[in-house]
Amino acid sequence: MSTLMLIDDTHDGQRLDNFLISHLKGIPLTRIYRAIRKGEVRVNKKRVNANCRLTIGDLVRIPPLRQTNVKKLLPLDKSLLVSLEMRILFEEADLLVINKPAGLSVHGGSGIDRGLIEALCLRQPKSQALKLVHRLDRETSGCLVVAKKRSLLVALHALLTQRKVVKQYLLLVKGHWKWGKRQVDAPLKKNILRNGERIVKVDETGKMATTLFQPLVSYPFSTLMEARPLTGRTHQIRVHAAHLGHPIAGDKKYGDKVFNREMKMLGLKRLFLHSAGILCRWDDRVLGVCALLDTDLFRFLNFLKRRESQS
């Protein structure tokens, strides 16, 4: 028996194929597109193309399709659920901002059973439309904005494209930063090494990326920095910092092995990169959220400060 779904503001403006993909988990893409082509899927009783844009009030008829290869997720560890609940910095009906812990991927996949989004969906099972407004690397902690409605996702993506979202990061880099405040404009290109590892490099044929760096505190052999990316390329801050000769402490992919080993001996157990704050304005709304450094990074900075005073 077919299912009828009424489109609300959550899916207003979304393509039909993307709408179906998000709702028909476990259905092969080829089957979904075949159902559209053959007219099994109807919008307001009419045949439509896959790129049809849905609007509020549309009635979508979805035929019964056999689900295959649906993966059932095991229950989350209760301690993780409690931890995530405590790390929510701000929440409204259409969005939430969470202080993502280091070591947790934003999405499951590539051998990872479950990521942050999957965990948040289990926290509130009815919120199946949770979408990342932006991304953080697995080992990066801090502010992460999640949209509960597609209309908000589109609005915030537009702000990001227009460079109207201020994102502030804290990072500890190798050496003494000598330039003061500096803007880095260096194109980045994704590459795949012979061993299959994915890596990003500065390359003239890549996409332009811009990052603002500013030194905050100098320590022996390292500097605490603020970084504000004006674009959103993969690994942008990490690659730009390394490109200038100041790789981030604890960065196993782009960092300095000797420096990382020294930092680890002093007590740093992970990448020192933290999304400290985000600020944006749209319509009549303002979103401004800060995330304090995680305890491990805060204690490490205090250790460096004490070590400097004793030397």
Where are these regions (language model features)?
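RNA pseudouridine synthases
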Residues: 1-194, 218, 298-306
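Short, well-ordered beta-strand segments enriched in hydrophobic/aromatic residues
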Residues: 96, 225-229
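Short aromatic-glycine motifs in intrinsically disordered, low-complexity regions
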Residues: 195-204
